């Protein structure tokens, strides 16, 4: 966020908004695992909270059937939406991902569908960089260990111009590619030394 300064103190005086003002937010649900018809021969991608660690979600480990979808309150999440883990073990809570496909989710994920003022990729990287801050919101909420929709909707985000959002996303993507290249190189060196 160096380009814009600290998101909390906003030293550059950029426009800001609460997530609830720039996006629709909702959580998913889980069909009963006791009803085989909800999970057998299923075609609807269904994302669990652990899958946020994939960063970009182009496939899900599980799928549900139309009957399973109809049996619960989960909703379809469009491609290019941001999801954030509300709960989870280890580092899961507060982790952010972006969907590359249409899918539905379990109740431990907040689905964030940005409006036209905020690019999905911008919001993804913006929230990803604020992981610790977001994760710590759970401790503020009456001593509970999880996040909730109200907390996520109340996060204030910087809303720079679309041009600045695009520049930020281009830089963040390049940084991701560089980290991936370094990791792959390290893995090659480790394997080569065996």
Locate each region found by the language model.
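Non-catalytic DNA-recognition/assembly elements of restriction-modification systems
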Residues: 1-30, 154, 158, 162-194
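Short, structured beta-strand/loop micro-motifs enriched in basic residues and often containing a Trp
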Residues: 59-68
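Short, Lys/Arg- and Gly-enriched loop/turn segments at beta-strand edges
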Residues: 91-98
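Basic, amphipathic alpha-helical recognition segments used for DNA target recognition
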Residues: 18-24, 53-59, 75-79, 98-102, ...
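Low-complexity, Lys/Gly-biased intrinsically disordered segments
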Residues: 12-54, 70-72, 148
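Short, surface-exposed beta-edge/turn micro-motifs
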Residues: 43-44, 79-82, 107-109
């Amino acid at each position: 966020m160096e380009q814009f300064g600290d998101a909390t103190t906003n030293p550059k005086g950029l426009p800001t908004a609460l997530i609830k003002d720039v996006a629709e937010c909702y959580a998913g649900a889980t069909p009963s695992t006791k009803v085989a018809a909800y999970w057998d021969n299923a075609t609807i991608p269904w994302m669990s909270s652990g899958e946020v660690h994939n960063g970009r979600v182009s496939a899900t480990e599980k799928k549900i059937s139309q009957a399973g979808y109809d049996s619960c309150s989960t909703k379809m999440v469009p491609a290019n939406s941001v999801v954030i883990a509300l709960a989870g073990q280890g580092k899961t809570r507060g982790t952010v991902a972006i969907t590359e496909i249409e899918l539905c989710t379990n109740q431990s994920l907040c689905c964030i569908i940005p409006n036209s003022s905020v690019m999905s990729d911008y919001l993804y990287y913006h929230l990803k960089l604020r992981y610790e801050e977001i994760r710590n919101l759970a401790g503020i909420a009456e001593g509970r260990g999880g996040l909730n929709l109200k907390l996520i909707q109340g996060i204030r985000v910087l809303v720079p111009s679309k041009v600045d959002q695009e520049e930020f996303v281009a830089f963040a993507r390049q940084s991701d590619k560089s980290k991936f290249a370094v990791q792959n190189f390290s893995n090659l060196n480790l394997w080569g030394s065996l």
